[in-house]
Amino acid sequence: MARPDLHERISSLRKLRVAQERVRVRRQVGRRDGVRLEIDGRWLTGFCSNDYLGLSQQFEVVAALQDAAARDGAGATASHLICGHHTAHETLERDIAEWLGYPSALLFGSGFIANLAVQQALLSEEDDVCVQDRLNHASLLDATRLAGCRLRRYPHLDVEGAMRQLKGAPEGAAMLASDGVFSMDGDVAPLRALSLVARMQEALFYVDDAHGVGVLGPQGRGCVADAGLGVAEVPLQLVTLGKALGGYGAVVVGEEALIRHLAETARPYIYTTALPPAQVAATLAAVRLARRDDWRRTRLTELIGTFRDGARRHGFELMASDTPIQPLLCGEEATVMAMSAALEQAGFLVGAIRPPTVPEGKARLRVTLSALHTPQQVQALVDAIVQARDVVSRQPQRALA
């Protein structure tokens, strides 16, 4: 039997994506100024980034990056366990652990890498199981598959479903893993109830709080702190550095023994170059600002209210989200693509999210807000969405859900 030809395979898959109008494209950003982006020679107001606190271009953050780059160069030049672990890395790990109330922390190159590292290092036996919310981020779900342990999923936010899945897999070590804030819906996991399930079933509870830290909880400490939980209930927690903190990378905070085990055994940590010290210095500055500047969270909360009030007045279907992620359901893919195109024509860049990222029939505009937006910009976006809906609804077989 002849082997499949990989070029023929990818050609067939490409043709299928084209037929389904599911080809993904990259937009080239020429320049950026706060929430404004230059794309194809036009300046657009962006409502699609994860820079929730507006820190990525903040003066102190950029100055810290420039100063460290002038001193330490462009890269770490080695992995953490060779000679790539600089003083800045150690300081950032310590500061984030202290901020979140955890004893220890470990830096990673990205949230995807960190989620893989956690599961590969802790769930190494065939009988081990990771129980997950069905709408968890792809990095959590893919990490389980790559780690080689069993994956069991429960319906979104279904605490009883999580209990059933853990009870149904009594052999081997168990982890219960959940997003804190769900990236496509913007809702928050029932962490207190899930922590009780994990304790009852002797499972380690792991929370990926990529979209919560910096935004929610006292001093922006995230979903876990906002739920009144800590290391006793959530022994491991993921924090990404490329969203509210405006930089790049990720940190896992947790019990000292667990973090030490990751540092000594997690292959994605051991066999990769450490983050550039200059990037780490920028994140150190961002952490200080995120902890100090409650006004950023206050403004963000006000802007979320402005958007939701305006959308409700015009009859839009909102999801149960009080976070900067505000999805507007559009239903069919053709509708959301037409809406997104109409908004861009009006001067706004809003992400169109469609299957397979979200379920069939649940395509949506994913509006994300930043503390740098103004109330006037948010109101202008709402007005533009109303106009786009009116235009699109007049087109055959295209109506908002």
UniProtKB/Swiss-Prot annotation:
N6-(pyridoxal phosphate)lysine modifications at: 243
Pfam families according to UniProt: Aminotran_1_2 (PF00155)
Residues annotated to bind pyridoxal 5'-phosphate: 111-112, 183, 211, 240
TM region positions: none
PROSITE patterns recorded: AA_TRANSFER_CLASS_2
PANTHER family on file: 8-AMINO-7-OXONONANOATE SYNTHASE (PTHR13693:SF100), CLASS II AMINOTRANSFERASE/8-AMINO-7-OXONONANOATE SYNTHASE (PTHR13693)
Protein name (database record): 8-amino-7-oxononanoate synthase
Gene: bioF
